[in-house]
Amino acid sequence: MADVADEELGFDNIDTVVGISINGIAFAYEVARILESDMTVFRTTDEGEGSGSLSNKYSQVAGKRVVIIDDVLSSGKTMSKTIQSIRAAGGEVSLAIVLVNKTTRNEIDDVPLRGLIRAVAV
């Protein structure tokens, strides 16, 4: 995932990595470590798909160039909510990376979307 971020943006153009809870956090931690960048978390809630908020216990995203990391993209609702939350907090979302993209989408809310694996029905 860090290699994808480097190929798409270059290490110097990434300030903060955002991991979507729960499964995206471990991937985001490793990407942030490799990139030597800050990290924060988008915490999902039980209120329904796509609900959640940015954690205030980690790095802030205001004025930062952000890469979002998650494990699986299915409907894209949680990723869209994450993008909206980062933008509302003053961050610039440059790229979204997932381990498995279960859609045919290559962007989401005008943000490039990259998946290490694409799994769609044929």
Name these PLM-found stretches.
Residues 1-9, 13:
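Active-site-facing substrate-recognition patch
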Residues 15, 64, 94:
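Conserved acidic residues
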Residues 11-21:
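Short glycine-rich phosphate-binding loop at a beta-alpha junction
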Residues 27-67, 77:
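Short, glycine/charge-rich flexible loops or terminal/linker lids adjacent to PRPP-binding catalytic cores
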Residues 10-11, 58-62, 88-89, 106:
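Solvent-exposed alpha-helices and their adjacent loops that cap or buttress functional pockets
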Residues 61-91:
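A contiguous pocket-lining binding segment that forms or flanks enzyme active sites
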Residues 83-122:
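PRPP-dependent phosphoribosyltransferase catalytic core
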